[in-house]
Amino acid sequence: QYYYRFGKLLIVDPDTADYVFNFQSKYDVRIVPPKQEGDHVERGLELLKELFLNGYSDRVKQELFPYALILADTIENTFTDQYVNMYTADRYIAFLVNDQMLNRTEKDKEKLSREWNNTFLNYSMDKAGWVVPEKFYLYSETEYAKKENWWIPIEGATEKDTADINIVWERGYPTGNWTYYYDDTWTNKIWGYAVSSSREGYLEKFFEFLFTAPQETINKAIVDHEKLRNAHDVLDQALKDDFGIDYRTMIYEAKD
């Protein structure tokens, strides 16, 4: 039904023809098909719908989804030697739906939904050529790379301090990494926030912010800080216009 509706594949029980999608160890990934016994596949499909598919319009599925979605019992990134919950490639996205995933708590399902959707939106930018409007960005690529823009020193701060994140938000950045650099003498540590140093990084961190921060935190941040609010509103509208989604409601909500 998925194929006839959107002209794309939803692979749950691969045959020989599907091995082009890596149900073997090659191309830096190894995918093991899901178990076919009992209601495992049906539960996997339901998990995919609830945590991911239901958040997107038919237009997005038709225009931006890859050629194939794959359900898997194991996804191993053989390049990094890590097992992952999701893997994106030019022509497919694989989702992990093994017993451990199917038996996650409601709160863990909510976290997984955020992870899957965040990964997909970054995939859409990288693989499908989606471009956020120019006015989303604070600076040109060259300006983002300047240290005075990506480094926010906090005078007198120490490692034990957790400096006010409002300082980062006021600059228009959604997140910052609390770290240090040495002064010109290479003897004294200067603590502060390191923020995105490129346009790509800025967009990635904004997605991370939208899909990991509590909504009340996002609301407070954009109400109090104009630069952050402007970027947020541009991205928010672009997601609605181009994906037909509202990030506030697309994520799976825990039932307990």
Tell me the role of every PLM-derived stretch:
Residues 2-256:
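First exposed extracellular module after export/assembly in secreted or surface-exposed proteins
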